[in-house]
Amino acid sequence: MLDFPNQSRVFDPTRRAVRFWGHDGAMEWSFYVSEDALKLLQPAMTRDEAALLSAFDSSRLAIYAAAKKAYKRSRKGSYELAAADF
């Protein structure tokens, strides 16, 4: 079962996304939630790094739910969550 025990997240300026990690047993999976997805979740958000990280923190439960759905659909090295995933 996918869990998110590590509350760490980091802004990836190349992808314009926030990266976070999920764990299933001993395996770790990378997830990226796009800037556009975060803007959908937090419409008043500005598009700077601090605002993106804050939007992630405020929407953590919805993001984790979308990540679990993506993980359930297929197993791969990393997952990108777009606005359509919410």
Residue positions per predicted region:
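A short, structured beta-strand/loop element
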Residues: 18-43
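Acidic, low-complexity intrinsically disordered segments
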Residues: 4, 44-86
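Short linear sequence elements within intrinsically disordered, low-complexity coil regions
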Residues: 9, 16, 25, 36-37, ...
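A broad, structure-centric signal for solvent-exposed, well-ordered loop/edge residues
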Residues: 8-11, 27, 40, 45-48, ...
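Short, charged/polar N-terminal "headpieces" of proteins
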Residues: 1-22, 27
